[in-house]
């Protein structure tokens, strides 16, 4: 018996020189309201990114054992707000800055460096007792918009149970992705059968304990087999395959793997960014951001199951006898 499948077998990470600008010159009076060192104490990030940001920090500390930067995991809205208000020099997000945010930073004498780091899939998870294994992207959009609320509205053979939808919180990167990308700039429903449970870990717990639930989390939470408190690995949870077609079938539905993200087979893909405003070219925040786009930093994303933004790769057919 032969089984043929595609795997990513090569990964050459590119170091692109000349893309790490430093910020010089004097800051205006608004920038100097807080001491530099006070602002440099910690990084901020959307909570859904915490597993891979922790890994990046661990890897960076191998180089910089004297690193004095702590983490504050919050929601994406507050993370960007803190960056703009000059309460941190670095934020990890899944969106770029708006023109208004760029202007505010410019008025404060700061030049943001927005660096794409990796690509992540927004994974849909269900309880293992749920009969569903595939879903069309447009059906999930109908669920989170409130158009449908029962499983048998997706497939008449499914039970008539209410679909319980779990996400982290209304200020998160997940919520924004659902509203902006899946619902095309329409508000996601947040009442009734759709509920915020605050964190990605709580989404996983909720789905594991509710057979009729569906949750949405970053795919980076699926892959860490070393920390079962963070991951879906070993839990009573199934990851749905999602189709771009109007009707999901086993042949047109894909999971959020590196391969399917790289080849754009999976419909729900987002970009992870580091946004750095550190005015010092040798500052810790700028050093951390730069590390994330260097080969060692990109390998951290690769090993976390994400697809690195700066990578060359090859795909071959592997035959197993």
Would you name each region that the model predicts?
Residues 23-77, 81-84, 118, 126-321:
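Exported/periplasmic ABC-transporter solute-binding proteins
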Residues 76-108, 223-227:
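Pocket-flanking alpha-helical
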Residues 112-113:
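Periplasmic N-terminal soluble interaction domains immediately after the signal peptide in Gram-negative
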């Amino acid at each position: 018996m032969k089984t043929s499948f595609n795997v990513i077998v090569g990964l050459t990470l590119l170091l692109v020189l000349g893309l790490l600008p430093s910020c010089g010159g004097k800051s205006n009076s608004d920038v100097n309201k807080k001491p530099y060192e006070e602002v440099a104490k910690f990084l901020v990030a959307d909570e859904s990114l915490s597993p891979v940001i922790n890994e990046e920090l661990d890897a960076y500390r191998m180089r910089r054992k004297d690193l004095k930067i702590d983490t504050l995991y919050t929601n994406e809205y507050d993370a960007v707000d803190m960056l703009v208000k000059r309460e941190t020099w670095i934020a990890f997000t899944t969106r770029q800055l708006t023109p208004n945010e760029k202007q505010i930073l410019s008025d404060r004498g700061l030049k943001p460096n927005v660096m794409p780091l990796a690509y992540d899939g927004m994974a849909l998870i269900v309880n293992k007792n749920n009969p569903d294994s595939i879903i069309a992207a447009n059906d999930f959009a109908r669920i989170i918009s409130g158009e449908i609320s029962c499983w048998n509205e997706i497939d008449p053979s499914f039970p008539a149970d209410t679909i319980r939808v779990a996400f982290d919180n209304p200020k998160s990167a997940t919520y924004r992705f659902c509203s902006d990308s899946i619902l095309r700039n329409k508000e996601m429903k947040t009442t009734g059968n759709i509920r915020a449970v605050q964190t990605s870990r709580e989404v996983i717990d909720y789905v594991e304990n509710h057979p009729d639930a569906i949750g949405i989390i970053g795919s980076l939470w699926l892959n860490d087999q070393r920390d079962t408190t963070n991951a879906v690995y070993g839990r009573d949870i199934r990851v749905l395959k999602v189709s771009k077609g109007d009707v999901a079938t086993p042949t047109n539905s894909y999971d959020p793997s590196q391969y399917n993200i790289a080849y754009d087979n999976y419909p729900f893909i987002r970009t992870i960014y580091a946004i750095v405003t550190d005015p010092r070219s040798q500052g810790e925040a700028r050093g951390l951001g730069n590390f994330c786009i260097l080969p060692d930093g990109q390998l951290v994303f690769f090993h976390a199951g994400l697809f690195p933004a700066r990578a060359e790769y090859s795909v071959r057919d592997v035959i197993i006898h």
